[in-house]
Amino acid sequence: VAMGMTDADGSQFYENAGHNDGFVGYYDVSEDAYESNYETAIETLKKYYTYDESTGMFTNFPTLTYLYNTGESHKAIGEYLSSALAAVGITMNLENQEWNTFLNTRKNGDYSIARNGWLADYNDPISFLDMWVTSSGNNDVQFGKGANKDVAAYSLDLTDLGYDVKVENGTWAETYDVIINLIKTCTDTATRYELMHRAEDLLMSTGCIVPLYFYTDLFMLDDSVQGFFSNPLGYKYFMNCTVSK
């Protein structure tokens, strides 16, 4: 869930994400954590692929392809990712498609890694969460779809919140879909937001979604202008503006 979405207590939702000491969210993105993050990633990959200690390279990692839509910034990100992976022996090719073709390819799940982006048109974290239910037209990761339908790798325990829900090694439909449905019917604000944090925890535990950056909306506004409003989609509203002299 991106910056700007508020939590039940009025704080930012992302500030309360994850369950880590010393940093916000699911990854420590500080400069001081770079080396330890790198080492953790290498050690994780060593469990599954052959690593040559003398060269610092993986020798049998499958070739990846990064799919992105036309745009210089998207291309630059892909080039950086490809370069960073090449440094440890992982080949990631780049594939550029125009927008409509890109959307269809991604929706069909015909990719190994693909760029994605999302904007919320209202201030509620559910806008970033319900898109990943099995039946969602935006579920391009293919959670619970096709060959992933019967993957039983997810766990969910909501008994501490008063729900008779405890699933071990369940499918996406038995876990994530369930918690999103509960969010949509919950009338208690504190419980509803806690359910959304649990949903995000489950989503991020899959490792299928890797946030790179948040969009920003830069503009200049003179101190004399009052009543200006900019919504989450970047639209600017001046109809209630006044200028103090």
What is each residue range found by the language model?
Residues 1-21, 77, 200-211:
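Periplasmic-binding protein-like
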Residues 45, 81-86:
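Hydrophobic alpha-helical packing residues
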Residues 86-145:
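Periplasmic binding protein-like
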Residues 38, 68-81:
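Bilobed "Venus flytrap"/periplasmic-binding protein-like clamshell domains
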